[in-house]
Amino acid sequence: MPHYNLPHNHGQNIEKVLDKIPPAERFRDIAFLFQQLDVPTRLRIFWLLCHCEECVCNIAAAVDMSAPAVSHHLRVLKKSGIISSRREGSLLLSV
């Protein structure tokens, strides 16, 4: 690990602090996930799915949108790995 010459020494061991920071590429992955939630409607859908699993029709009713519009947002969230889905009989539930 490189030596860091800090302008102020506050008594902390900078190497111990830096060991806790994930690699830069991990932050790029996290930033990408946050970008997917940058659309307020998509964030509302995500919030709903954090609390329950639901079908497209119920999500659409809850956020006052058409089912195709909700499907589009679900597709983006699923493609980015933020949510998943499972089949229950003829229903496809987003989780």
Give the residues covered by each predicted segment.
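Hydrophobic side chains within alpha-helical segments
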Residues: 45, 75-76
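N-terminal helix-turn-helix DNA-binding core of bacterial DNA-binding proteins
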Residues: 24-68, 90-95
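Intrinsically disordered, low-complexity cationic segments
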Residues: 7, 71-72
